[in-house]
Regions:
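A detector for small-residue-rich transmembrane helices and their helix-helix packing motifs
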Residues: 1-223
Length: 223
């Protein structure tokens, strides 16, 4: 079987808990006193220097708005459940928190000293890199493509945003850092990581070929 498909709810107990925590933390942050949120929940250089080191963890669960939250939770569901299914919950948690915490810390030099950081995006990027090197052909019905292809496209978009200095509230650099942190984990956990990397690149090539064929030969038939 070329693409592996499994029960989407199999082996995702930790993923479910993380998603619930993100929803609860975000809902609290949206309704709480802004000063409390700024000092006790979001991550920033000032909070770190003030000794509020827990914010490097709490900030992972807090999201800026509903769109930010829902978008991240979709990708957390896809990649978190996949990693739990092919590895185990402990490795999934290790990748998630390592990616989130270290990405926040390493992002500080790239942003103004008064910048604040929230969201699970960087942690999820760590998961995408691990999954890409472990199970790239796992098909996601939610995203309608293999997870290896999603990971590569996800990375390329953010790399392009960094290269072209796209102005946005999104911390693209943090995403790239998170993805980079996931690569050594994927290499360590997957004996076939080289093959899986080539598979992911092959999926990307096939995607662009298909896109070219559709735009060149199919779309003109309807225009």
């Amino acid at each position: 079987m070329l693409f592996s498909v499994s029960d989407p709810f199999l082996g995702m107990r930790v993923t479910t808990v993380l998603i619930l925590l993100c929803f609860l933390a975000s809902l609290y942050a949206w309704t709480a006193n802004p000063v409390t949120v700024q000092n006790d929940l979001v991550f920033s250089l000032s909070n770190l220097l003030a000794g509020r080191v827990w914010t490097v963890v709490t900030a992972i669960f807090v999201h800026a708005n509903l769109l930010h939250l829902v978008g991240n939770m979709i990708f957390l569901y896809v990649f978190g459940s996949t990693l739990e299914g092919v590895a185990d919950s402990k490795r999934m948690l290790l990748a998630f928190f390592l990616g989130g915490i270290v990405s926040f810390l390493l992002s500080l030099p790239f942003f103004p000293s008064d910048a604040t950081f929230v969201g699970a995006s960087a942690a999820i990027f760590t998961l995408t890199a691990v999954v890409m090197l472990m199970k790239p052909l796992r098909f996601s019905f939610l995203l309608l493509m293999p997870v290896g292809l999603v990971a590569v496209l996800y990375f390329l978009y953010n790399a392009a945003a960094v290269y072209y200095h796209l102005q946005s509230d999104v911390a693209y650099v943090s995403h790239i850092i998170g993805f980079s942190l996931g690569l050594p984990l994927g290499i360590a956990w997957s004996p076939q990581w080289k093959r899986n990397l080539l598979v992911s690149i092959g999926l990307l090539a096939a995607y662009f070929v298909l896109l070219y064929l559709i735009t060149t030969y199919v779309l003109p038939l309807f225009l």
